[in-house]
A protein has these predicted regions:
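Pre-Walker A adenine-sensing motif
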Residues: 77-94
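Mid-core helix/loop region of P-loop NTP-binding domains shared across ATPases and GTPases
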Residues: 68-69, 136-143, 150-190, 196-205, ...
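Conserved catalytic segments around the Walker B and adjacent sensor/switch elements
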Residues: 122-132
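Conserved adenine-nucleotide phosphate-binding loops and their immediately adjacent elements
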Residues: 66-80
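C-terminal alpha-helical "lid" subdomain
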Residues: 1-60, 226, 233, 240-306
């Protein structure tokens, strides 16, 4: 039986604590990147492979997490002008039923608004994010189904099971909706129609960049225009609409540093958007200098156009 070093024993103790935190040893092993069977054998002293190599994975995992813990972690959700308005669009969509669109520049708070709305309305909201690989009707229905415990099947079976599982007054948020195909949007719209026919409401909010309303589908642009005309609310947002008050909420430490605040507002209103401003502040914070001079220097280091 191999004698473990103090560092290796410490890693095993951290794994034990992580398992207690996550609720199972299996979850802890998956998160730390080590096979559960290997971990169990190492603990028991029966592992016949390279123990040092396996425990190095665990040691490196916790070292990475501990190093990351001291970095700037952000302020969590911040109700900026734009993110608050996106939430209003989603709320009205849920109350009225039917389709709604909230789109605009990347990095201005749309996704954070969706996540926050989903957290606040977890029992009546289904939130999914699509991507270039998940955009077909079946793939998106499977994504929605996974959120409400509907098993995969044919497109028709998925549609029927999902409509049976959803209930009056719910809302589905589709983030990164610019990736959706016309057929997928029609499949989703038909869910709204199904509830409307029963005298009930089901809202679907499409959230994404501006192509969500003016470029989706390429050659099928006219068909998407017809869908847009059937939406009850369409909002288009721009980084240029970011307010000084938003910057004060996002970076409260800068409230008394007017030059720094104005500089961050310029960044947020540019193509860098709010996300770029947050990244800049994060790097400057970790570098130990969030003064105006420090922020400008970091922006230059990051090759930001300012």
């Amino acid at each position: 039986m191999k004698v473990l070093s103090d560092k290796q024993n410490e890693a095993l103790e951290k794994m034990k604590n992580l398992a207690a935190e996550l609720g199972s040893e299996a979850a802890a092993c998956k998160q730390a990147g080590i096979s559960q069977s290997v971990y169990t054998a190492v603990k028991k002293g029966t592992y016949t492979g390279d123990v040092d190599k396996q425990l190095a994975k665990v040691i490196d995992y916790f070292a990475t997490k501990e190093a990351a813990a001291v970095l700037y972690a952000g302020t969590g959700y911040v109700p900026t002008t734009i993110s608050s308005d996106v939430q209003k669009v989603i709320r009205n969509c849920q109350l009225q039923g039917g389709l709604a669109i909230a789109c605009g520049d990347a990095g201005i708070g749309k996704t954070e608004a969706c996540k926050e709305y989903s957290r606040q309305h977890s029992t009546t909201c289904v939130y999914v994010t699509v991507n270039p690989c998940i955009k077909s009707a079946k793939a998106v229905l499977e994504l929605i189904g996974a959120q409400i415990n509907v098993s995969s099947g044919s497109v028709s079976r998925l549609w029927l099971d999902i409509t049976a599982k959803l209930s009056d007054g719910m809302v589905i948020i589709i983030d990164e909706a610019q990736h959706l195909t016309y057929k997928t949007i029609e499949s989703l719209r038909s869910i709204c129609d199904h509830f409307d026919a029963k005298g009930q409401t089901l809202g679907i909010a499409f959230v994404g960049n501006e192509t969500t309303v003016n470029q989706l589908g390429g050659k099928q642009k006219a068909e998407f225009a017809q869908i847009r005309n059937r939406t009850k609310n369409t909002r288009i947002y721009s980084s240029k609409k970011v307010q000084r008050s938003d910057i004060e909420l996002l970076f409260p430490d800068l409230v008394n540093d007017v030059p720094a605040l104005e500089f961050m507002l310029r960044i947020a209103q540019s193509s860098q958007a709010v996300r770029g401003a947050v990244n800049l502040y994060s790097n400057a914070h970790d570098n130990g200098n969030v003064t105006h001079k420090g922020l400008v220097a970091m922006a230059k280091y990051m090759d930001m156009a300012v």
